[in-house]
Amino acid sequence: NEIISQHLLNGVLSDNGYFQHIRKDKFFSLYIAYLLIKYGGDPNFSRNLMFCNNTLQTEKMFALALGRLESRADGKILCSYIYDKEKNEIGDFHSGMFFRETTSIKGVKISVFFKIDEEKGMINISFRSTDDIDVSKAANFFGGGGHKVAAGAHIRGEFSEVKEKTLKLLEDLLRDPDSISS
């Protein structure tokens, strides 16, 4: 029915970045999207849900994250962070917004986002990359997981140390993709 088709279409479109990561030899999700639209799913509804649904608080958190943007490896790596307490004060923030913007910047190969929970001593690391860099290797190194272009890990530690270790690992990954085993 239309409701189920819509929910499934939302998932397909969200999972592959609204077709930003489609390879010409792997187009099955395009066919699935076609079928879901045929059975009543509305891609415009999905787009509005994903891209036109932010609150003022979300935009303020996004501005904070962009204001902290840091570049490494001649602009090939971008990173930023937010603290859990900031989320509680300003409002929630979905890192997908951050990744949509940072991965669209010319020359960027890897974007990394840190969510820091100082109270629990935990840091959530999220990675995104272009198709030629396998960030799941970095996530696996920290005990996390994911797939080639989107991965993450939870790690205990002091933020400045975790950040430097992460960025060094990503610089190594850029220089030699085989330097980190997956």
PLM feature spans:
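Hydrophobic helix-and-loop "lid/oligomerization" segment in the mid-to-C-terminal part
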Residues: 3-9, 13-141, 146-182
